[in-house]
Amino acid sequence: MEVDSSPMTPTEYMEEDRSPVPDSNAMDVSEADENENDDLASVAALIDQLKHEDVQLRVNACQKLTVIAAALGPERARDELIPFLDDSIDDEDEVLLVLAEELPNLSPFLGGSEYIPRLLVPLENLAAIEDGTVRDKAVESLRNIASQMDDNQRNNDFAPLVKRLAQGEWFTSRASAAGLFAVCYTAFDAQRQEEWRNMFAQLVRDETPMVRRSTAKALETLAGVVSDEHLDSFILPLFNELASDDQDSVRLLTIEILIAIAKRLDAQKNRETLLEPLKSLARDKAWRVRYMVASKFVEVCDTIGEDIVRAELVQTFVDLLKDNEGEVRTAAAGEVPGFAKFADKETILESFLPCIRELVEDGNQHVRAALALHISGLSPILGKEDTIEHLLPLFLQLLKDEFPDVRLNVIANLEQINKVIGIDLLSQSLLPAITELAEDRQWRVRLAIIEYIPLLASPLGVEFFDDKLLNLCMSWLGDAVYSIREAATINLKKLTQVFGAEWAKDTVITQIIKMADNENYLYRMTTIFTLTTMTDALSPSIIKDYVLPTVIGLSEDPIPNIRFNVAKALETLTPSLKMDASTSDLIESTVVPSLQKLTNDKDGDVRFFASRALLDAKDQKPSL
């Protein structure tokens, strides 16, 4: 398969009097020919890459199949490109994966919808290879193509393909076939539908677990397209077979089928047909099956019916919370708030809370972390009084957990508790723990506390905040971790927005300015960052009297990093100075001279940032 990329011979025009001035139209034609030749050469290169020994080049070429097909034209794309691709099935898996993904995109380049079935041949072969990822992509692409077909093509081309795969000698083809039954089921007549149900049932009973796993995945979708009659006579029996399969890898997939069936049945039918299988799966001998039930429990409850949940499933959920496997308890802990919505307050207090108290002290840190992340969801359900009485002690205990993720998860959801019990009570109850966590050895915990502080500021008031939390906020500026120092500067800006610029001047800025004289250059650097970050929240007079002199004073610092950050800070300050008449003259009198001096600095980085800031400063015009 080749593309003719040889240059075309230009048409020669014979003229008696040839003007020495080039004809623009002729030049346009020449350029067009040249561009066309370049395009053909590019396509030829792509075709060569399809056969190249370098795997990555073959992958790249497969990603450009539509370009190749467009250049070849419909006939050659059908008769040459697709057969060539079909012959490439023995390639590396990464090439085949891209090929399986790109083949459906060729349908617009084949010359009409009647040629779409041509794409089935290579995809059928891809659906039978050993690599599961490639097979899954091929099945996805086959479903895509089937959706583009008319009913005649589905019956005459697609259905025979599925039958061949379903009856294939190798389990790989049979596993792929399972995922193709639902896509065209409704387009078939009753006789063909019955044939497909029988074929699918054979796959459900296949001797190979991998095939049965595929049918378990596919039955969920098939349950959504069969008639009500066949849901009862066909889907439910197959579900029960799979739910009692001897392989746990098959059984764990059936919870999704149960949900799909429950969505189509009424509450009474769900009670009669699905309740016992659900309970059986929830106490399955394999922990992976119980884990799947626990992780989907709220979704099951949403579909199976509220009355059934309250009457039949409370104890089932409690058993999952007490499961002997940590992974199951972790999954169940994540479902606590969602399941609690189906239960009354008495049930929560009598049945769930004892389990939750045990989980707070669970030996598995992941269980405690999952509980910490979701326990706050009980607050809106229990209300203020019961939250204070029953949940606050558990929050405090989790805040003191030795595992940092547990502490982080509680902090991340304090806002939900705050909405129920109010910030005053929350701060009084949790402030000692918050103060302790502010010095936590894990920097991520300290970061979470910093980000929560502004939410406490307004409700606590200035006096309480200054007395209990101000020193803490200032101490973070000297933290050994950069992310903490950065968050601390943003925190001070937010606090200034809450308490006002005068508060910042009297309490914060004076302490920041003292850091400019610290022997440790990191403190001096933090001074620049903090003042620059806070600028937007400060008044022009404070910038003029405190911020600018401090920044200018550091322009002669012996550390180059300090000096070029001074230049960057002055660049940031310039717009703020320009906005007010009382400070606009400082640009020419103070900022520009300082920057001019820095442009002659011996350090290249300092000169660069100073020059950039100087250009910006000189462009600024005082506002009138």
Residue map of PLM features:
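Extended, low-complexity, acidic/polar intrinsically disordered regions
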Residues: 1-624
